[in-house]
Amino acid sequence: MGRFSEDSADEPDEREMSAALTVGEGDIDASLRPRSLGEFIGQPRVREQLQLVLEGAKNRGGTPDHILLSGPPGLGKTSLAMIIAAELGSSLRVTSGPALERAGDLAAMLSNLVEHDVLFIDEIHRIARPAEEMLYLAMEDFRVDVVVGKGPGATSIPLEVAPFTLVGATTRSGALTGPLRDRFGFTAHMDFYEPSELERVLARSAGILGIELGAEAGAEIARRSRGTPRIANRLLRRVRDYAEVRADGVITRDIAKYALEVYDVDELGLDRLDRAVLSALTRSFGGGPVGVSTLAVAVGEEATTVEEVCEPFLVRAGMIARTPRGRVATAQAWTHLGMKPPANAVGLGQTGLFD
């Protein structure tokens, strides 16, 4: 694939059920990455669209339009960026939005690109404004204006940039400014995985890692993985530890269930903190409504952790509803905790994500 440079600012997260990379997980995660669109599991619509974009560019002998990959963490945006470069036979340069604090940081990176290179900017919604404004011109006209000097004597020197393809990844497409978003010729929206797709991901990972994984065990892990391949692979490694230490190393369905109970991952993929949030919401606040800051204090966590890590899955799973007055526990949340929902519980008589 040629040159590879990484300057990513992934912030480690220690929770088993967080879709963010954990400390020391990067190398393992990289070993499991697919190397081509053919190896990439899931996201069939995105794969088809990308194949057309890339094949069209190769047939013309040019560079593809700039590509934006949008979706929750852990779904394979970084893997797709690497695949894009590999499919084009191009070199890949990797950085992240938070790492580009000044326009000069970006100018230095752009000036080192050669024709047909792929520049991947992770968390592109967090790029500093001066760097973002420089990126506009680079994306459109393949040049940048570098300001030399200060004050009235400052001069702008135009520098040519080799034709390249920018691949941006974001978990918050709404946080992108309009001018930046409009400069991407193609946007891929990535969705959570179906359990059957995660079973295929797990089977592939087990083969690479030399793990003996039964089909029923794979299904058990998949349905607790929040629709996220990164979480599925992490749970696979934790279950492997359990199987090797407390059994014969073979992962059966029962072994998977016992292991996930040890790691506090329940049958719906909720972990200790998720259940603590639901417990506080139902037992301490009568089901709500309650503000996220108050809820965070009740469980001893930062409000941003509850809002950005726990809440999205709990809302998607039908456990919590957002209202103008605050968060409310649904009937499914009460039932999941083994309690009878009140008569006025949100969603009473309706089915949730896992029903």
From Swiss-Prot:
EC number: 3.6.4.-
Start and end residues of each stretch annotated as Large ATPase domain (RuvB-L): 1-193
Single GO term (MF): ATP binding
Lineage top rank: taxon: Bacteria
Intracellular or extracellular location(s): Cytoplasm
Binding-site list for ATP: L32, R33, G74, K77, T78, S79, E140, D141, F142, R183, Y193, R230
Class in the EC hierarchy, top level: hydrolase
Residues binding Mg(2+): T78
A single Gene Ontology CC term: Holliday junction resolvase complex
Keyword Acetylation tagged: no
Keywords: ATP-binding, Cytoplasm, DNA damage, DNA recombination, DNA repair, DNA-binding, Hydrolase, Nucleotide-binding
Catalytic activity from the UniProt record: ATP + H2O = ADP + phosphate + H(+)
InterPro entries linked to this entry: AAA+_ATPase, AAA_lid_4, DNA_helicase_Holl-junc_RuvB, P-loop_NTPase, RuvB-like_N, RuvB_C, WH-like_DNA-bd_sf, WH_DNA-bd_sf
Region: Small ATPAse domain (RuvB-S), residue numbers: 194-264
Residues annotated to bind DNA: R322, R327
Keyword Methyltransferase: no
Domain remarks in the Swiss-Prot or TrEMBL record: Has 3 domains, the large (RuvB-L) and small ATPase (RuvB-S) domains and the C-terminal head (RuvB-H) domain. The head domain binds DNA, while the ATPase domains jointly bind ATP, ADP or are empty depending on the state of the subunit in the translocation cycle. During a single DNA translocation step the structure of each domain remains the same, but their relative positions change.
Xref: PANTHER family: HOLLIDAY JUNCTION BRANCH MIGRATION COMPLEX SUBUNIT RUVB, PTHR42848
Function field: The RuvA-RuvB-RuvC complex processes Holliday junction (HJ) DNA during genetic recombination and DNA repair, while the RuvA-RuvB complex plays an important role in the rescue of blocked DNA replication forks via replication fork reversal (RFR). RuvA specifically binds to HJ cruciform DNA, conferring on it an open structure. The RuvB hexamer acts as an ATP-dependent pump, pulling dsDNA into and through the RuvAB complex. RuvB forms 2 homohexamers on either side of HJ DNA bound by 1 or 2 RuvA tetramers; 4 subunits per hexamer contact DNA at a time.
Subunit field text: Homohexamer. Forms an RuvA(8)-RuvB(12)-Holliday junction (HJ) complex. HJ DNA is sandwiched between 2 RuvA tetramers; dsDNA enters through RuvA and exits via RuvB. An RuvB hexamer assembles on each DNA strand where it exits the tetramer. Each RuvB hexamer is contacted by two RuvA subunits (via domain III) on 2 adjacent RuvB subunits; this complex drives branch migration. In the full resolvosome a probable DNA-RuvA(4)-RuvB(12)-RuvC(2) complex forms which resolves the HJ.
Family: Belongs to the RuvB family.
Protein name listed in UniProt: Holliday junction branch migration complex subunit RuvB
Organism (species): Mycolicibacterium vanbaalenii (strain DSM 7251 / JCM 13017 / BCRC 16820 / KCTC 9966 / NRRL B-24157 / PYR-1) (Mycobacterium vanbaalenii)
Gene name as annotated: ruvB
